[in-house]
Structure formats: C-alpha cells, structure tokens
C-alpha cells in the first residue's frame, strides 16, 4: 500500500520496482525471486549479459537515483537495469539497486563495464535522419553509418541519430568513449549531441551552422511539446571533441572559451 501511495504521488516506476526488489532480497532472498519467475537474479554471472545502462539528467532525477547503483558522467547520471525480457513489445526489467549489487558481491565498476559491453552486443546504430524519415514513408532499412567515413559536403541535411537496434534506452551509448570516437571519425569533425530522449540522441556536426543558444532552445521546445515527461533525457546540449572524444556541456564550453580568450587578450596587452 505504501509503495502504491508513493507511485500515485509521483514516484517513478523504476524506483518502485527497485523498492520491491530490495524487499524481496531482504525478506527471503532467492526463494522469493523463484516465485517471481526470476530464479537466477542473484547469480551475477547469469545476469551480467542482461545488464543495460540507463541514462538521465542527474539534476532532474534525484529521487529515481536515490537507491540505485549510479555513475556520474558530466550532466548525466547512469543507472543500471537487468533486462529480464526484451522483445518487440518492450522491455521487462529490474533496476540494479545497492542491495542487489551487494548480493552479487561485485563493484560498481564491474557493473558499469559489463553493462556497457552488453549494450554494444545489442547493436550500435548511427543513422541519417533523412533516411529514417524516408524509411517510415517508403519502407526499407536505413544504413548504419557508424563505421563509414562520410563526405559531409554531399550530405544535404547533416543530422544523425545514435541508438541501438531495438531503439529502446539507446541514448546511454553516448557515454562510451570509443563510440564517440567512431562518430567523430565518421563525420570528420567535432559534433553536438542533442539529448532528444532516453531512447536516442541526435548528432549534429559542428560545421558553423548551429549556434548553442538556438540548439538549447530547440531541445527545450521539443521536450515541452513532443516528448513524454518520463522519456525526456535532458535539456542540456553537449559538445564532443573529435580528437579527444571528450564530451562537455556546450554552453559551459563556450563560456570557458570566451574566458580563456579574454585572458589571452589581457596577457597580450599586459
């Protein structure tokens, strides 16, 4: 009853499911999970390939993250889930709480590494948005461009989507440095990351056309008008350096560069 009351008063589903899992662990351990139809949940070796990284804006999700295994990545926080079942209709999952991690006897670092590997095994896709729209109208499958080296002068509308094959909870692929490096090599330039939803992010090459304030305004408008609250990822546009694959808040980066430029001018005058 108390969990139901918390849910109807705004507590997110992931937190409620995590609370149930914790109560099962504390109550009777494995026997309870047998009754739930997940007998192997306490066997980490059997669960590690089912792990998935979930990503969210850490400022927006303090309640969701409270009892979870969490790693921080700039503006984002990653938490982790065990996907008990994945099919065309959706995902049945249990969030990885601190209690569950302790039962497994593994570290946060181990969970993160195994979850990232499991995410790669689900397939990483970088797709031209124009091809996505065309496939929705005319059918067909958009080409995965991740391992390509594009001639950006021939790309009419340079906007790309990073997600996984199932297009569910694919935005977290953004956290993997080698994937960011592949994207930079594909585009041949630095790039912006638009946090469109928890399922995917949009990639825009830094070709001088896009301005950070305009991109931030676009994200905020799309969040308010087109994305369900529980599927919103963030309103903070990111910038990624092609050479280093380092990702940072685009607005803060511009402020930092302006400050450095002003300091250099002052030094020259001095």
What are these model-derived regions, one by one?
Residues 164-270:
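C-terminal structured domains
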């Amino acid at each position: 009853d108390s969990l139901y009351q918390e849910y109807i008063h705004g507590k997110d589903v992931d937190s409620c499911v995590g609370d149930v899992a914790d109560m099962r662990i504390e109550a009777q351990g494995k026997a309870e999970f047998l009754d739930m139809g997940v007998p192997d949940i306490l066997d980490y070796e059997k669960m590690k390939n089912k792990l998935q990284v979930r990503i969210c804006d850490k400022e927006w999700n303090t309640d969701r993250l409270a009892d979870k295994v969490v790693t921080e990545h700039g503006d984002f926080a990653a938490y982790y889930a065990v996907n008990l079942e994945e099919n065309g209709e959706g995902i049945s999952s249990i969030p990885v709480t601190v209690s569950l991690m302790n039962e497994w006897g593994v570290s946060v670092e181990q969970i993160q590494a195994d979850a990232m590997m499991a995410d790669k095994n689900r397939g990483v896709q970088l797709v031209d948005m124009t091809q996505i729209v065309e496939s929705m109208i005319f059918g067909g499958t958009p080409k995965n461009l991740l391992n390509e080296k594009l001639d950006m002068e021939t790309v009419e509308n340079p906007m790309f989507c990073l997600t996984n094959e199932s297009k569910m909870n694919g935005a977290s692929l953004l956290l993997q440095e080698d994937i960011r490096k592949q994207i930079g090599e594909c585009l041949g330039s630095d790039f912006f990351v638009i946090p469109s939803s928890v399922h995917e992010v949009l990639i825009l090459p830094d070709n001088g056309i896009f301005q950070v304030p305009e991109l931030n305004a676009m994200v905020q408008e799309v969040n308010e008008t087109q994305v369900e609250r529980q599927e919103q990822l963030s309103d903070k546009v990111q910038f990624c350096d092609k050479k280093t694959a380092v990702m940072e808040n685009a607005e803060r980066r511009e402020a930092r560069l302006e400050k450095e430029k002003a300091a250099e001018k002052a030094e020259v005058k001095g």
